[in-house]
């Protein structure tokens, strides 16, 4: 009997090795919640998944419900060429993904996080390398605010002025 499937749009935040040929994907779903799924065979040299599950990319997925983790059956990539080929731009996306991995939770929806991150990653693909830190910092501050963790920047921590 086949497993029930569903469509999901998500951003790939992290890839973790599982066994010899599989990957566990940590994703930011379109509803802003965290999602984890297995991409079977994604680490094999001839895998079609390898090129379609790039870090910091928006992907359209067909996912089957699994016992503990869902299973990616199909993936379609919205490529961000500059993030893939330029180390400065990819380095700007890394702290964004790390923070999102820490502030998002499975089942806790925050759709503004997906929209913000998609826009920031798209911006990273268009800006000069000198502007990458500004885009990254803006995303980090907005993410903290959307997660209810906005730092107070209008007064000195030491003296309160």
Predicted regions located by residue number:
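Non-catalytic alpha-helical scaffolds and adjoining flexible linkers that form interface surfaces
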Residues: 1-161
């Amino acid at each position: 009997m086949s497993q029930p499937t569903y469509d999901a749009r998500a951003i790939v935040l992290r890839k973790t090795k599982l066994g010899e040929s599989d990957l566990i994907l940590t994703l930011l779903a379109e509803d802003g919640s965290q999602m984890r799924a297995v991409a079977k065979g994604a680490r094999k040299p001839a895998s079609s998944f390898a090129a379609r599950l790039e870090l910091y990319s928006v992907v359209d997925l067909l996912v089957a419900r699994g016992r503990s983790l869902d299973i990616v059956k199909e993936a379609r990539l919205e490529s961000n060429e500059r993030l893939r080929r330029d180390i400065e731009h990819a380095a700007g996306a890394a702290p964004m993904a790390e923070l999102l991995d820490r502030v998002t939770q499975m089942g806790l929806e925050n759709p503004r996080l997906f929209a913000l991150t998609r826009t920031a990653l798209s911006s990273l693909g268009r800006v000069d390398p000198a502007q990458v830190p500004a885009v990254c910092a803006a995303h980090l501050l907005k993410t903290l605010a959307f997660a209810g963790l906005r730092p107070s920047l209008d007064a000195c921590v030491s003296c309160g002025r």
